[in-house]
Amino acid sequence: MVQNRAIFCFLSTIKSEETMTSESQPQVTQTRKFFGTDGIRGMANIHPMTPDLVLKLGRAAGHVFRVGDKRHTVIIGKDTRLSGYMFESALLAGLTSMGIHCLQVGPLPTPAIAFLTRALRADAGIMISASHNPFHDNGIKFFGPNGMKLPDELELEIERVLLSDEDLPMPTPHHLGRAHRIDDALGRYIEFAKTSFPKDLRLDGLRVVVDCAHGAAYKVAPAVLWELGAEVVTLGNHPNGTNINDGVGSLYPQEMVKRVQEVRADVGIAFDGDADRVVICDERGEILDGDVILAMSALEMKRKGVLRGDGVVATVMSNLGLERALAAEGLTLARTKVGDRYVLEHMLAHGFNLGGEQSGHLIFLDHNTTGDGLISALSVLALMTTQAQPLSKLANVMQRVPQVLQNVTIARGSDPMDDSRVVAAIAEAEAQLGTRGRILVRKSGTEPKVRVMVEGDDTAHITALASGVCEAIKRASNGFGEG
């Protein structure tokens, strides 16, 4: 199991949630100006994602990271967005001006940055990416020396320094940082990913369609699959700076499904722009989301005697069918608020080694410290190879309860959640569902949207309930439409 090392000397532990409901967990994000649930994110060249602010962010982070007389090192990676070059340069200027050495690794998946931060004994890792968002967005996310996302307290300290008017102590010219490019970073991650696959197995005879979303996995994912023996059919592996997530990848799996059916592949794999999440389809083209992958993986890990915590950690968004599938095998489902960082915190605090989100952020803690789309895909391929069964049959371990998810775009900074019309609509939906379903309404931590999720046995009924709540949110948000 990957060990949880100390992060910085002034931060002793990562605080874990005491309970598993989104309402009762620490609401640290309410006091934030820039950091959301997954770092800082926004449209490139528009506040806050401007080069001047990112330069200041680099200086603030460098000030916080610089503890004692030790020379500190930070890994910097990015996905394939055009604006990545601009933000990489801004971060380099800010960090090196504070005496921080920077190691640039180029376009690589987010989980590769987590791995390299540990492997190269760096003090921190930084990924420049907006994940599944369109190319015009970008973001900055931080990792500690243990390869885990920074705890809330440390992000808040960086933000405090960023917003303050204090004159930061600057190093003398002899003590400025240096920037160096690591040329073999891709090869290092390829070998690391392969170590998660059983040494006595190969993928010979398996035809795999892989959609890289024109993103960070465009080189590494096909290479890993090919080296393990698979026949690889690639999609979305020609990034041009503006086509990342553009009709391809985990948010748009239709092309993957179509290609699987055309070439009669055994499985389809689709990553998002930074490859920290994955969506898979079986040989018939049926989509398997993160909940199904968690169910399959949990049962296989239990069979092998390697599942810890007697269950799985997921979020309040996970389908009730996952909970039922696990319960049938004597396993529990622990739920956290939305965000893979909170899933990981609960896993660490309570001894679990498997967790994730319905969206495809899956954490196999024995292999990596963050959601890793490639390692998640390899775990499914290993299961297919071990069981010698088609994926459609393996996926039958879980029966989904009908679930509807709708999004409403709102004005940035607005909060319609306390509006009486919204409160009344939610109460009415809860009354109609009773004990036969559930409703969850929450603001996104990464986009100006409110997400409405309704579960129940009747698809038409829950769709109508979700639409009613969305209409109330639209009215409370002065006419902003559906997203």
From Swiss-Prot:
Keyword field contains Transcription: no
Description of post-translational modifications: Activated by phosphorylation.
Cofactor(s) listed: Mg(2+)
GO biological process assignments: carbohydrate metabolic process; peptidoglycan biosynthetic process; UDP-N-acetylglucosamine biosynthetic process
Record function comment: Catalyzes the conversion of glucosamine-6-phosphate to glucosamine-1-phosphate.
Modified residues (Phosphoserine): 131
NCBIfam families assigned: glmM (TIGR01455), PRK10887.1 (NF008139)
Cysteine-cysteine disulfides: none
GO function terms (MF aspect): magnesium ion binding; phosphoglucosamine mutase activity; phosphomannomutase activity
Binding site for Mg(2+): 131, 272, 274, 276
Enzyme class, broadest EC rank: isomerase
Cofactor note: Binds 1 Mg(2+) ion per subunit.
GO CC annotations, alphabetized: cytosol
Keyword annotations from UniProtKB, A to Z: Isomerase, Magnesium, Metal-binding, Phosphoprotein
HAMAP family: GlmM_B
Protein name: Phosphoglucosamine mutase
Protein family per UniProt: Belongs to the phosphohexose mutase family.
Short name of one Pfam family: PGM_PMM_II
Keyword Cytoplasm attributed: no
EC numbers on record: 5.4.2.10
Active-site positions on this chain: 131
Reactions catalysed, as given in the entry: alpha-D-glucosamine 1-phosphate = D-glucosamine 6-phosphate
